[in-house]
């Protein structure tokens, strides 16, 4: 199911997807990427994504999205890759509460919130497990409207190999610290 609606640049809306059975799907990465004109998404909150390992670029460059459905209860326990997840969602002011997502297996968070330049705050992702993450490059790069971040000082960054431009172009003064420096 990866890239199923990818590059539908003029698509403004989608039909009801709530009844889609994706319980055996392992990759939904890029499903809505490059849907530049998509304003909102149908309800996908009840999707069973327990077997999904890849959601990279799921909403990548959905420039016109002004809100997202509630994806807070998704079972993310098998996901390994969230890079480019919300990349370029320039009009999103807030995100669903993804604070309880299971991030134990995630290795790549790079560019996840890149250029979400209307976001004022993020859900409390301070309890995300990051001990398997190896890349957080540009994770918050271009989030120029952020006035605060959750306390990510408890993130375990000991295995991170790539971390350049994490807060690049975050214009507001953010008080930042991490648990360890590798």
What is the predicted role of each segment?
Residues 1-182:
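Negatively charged
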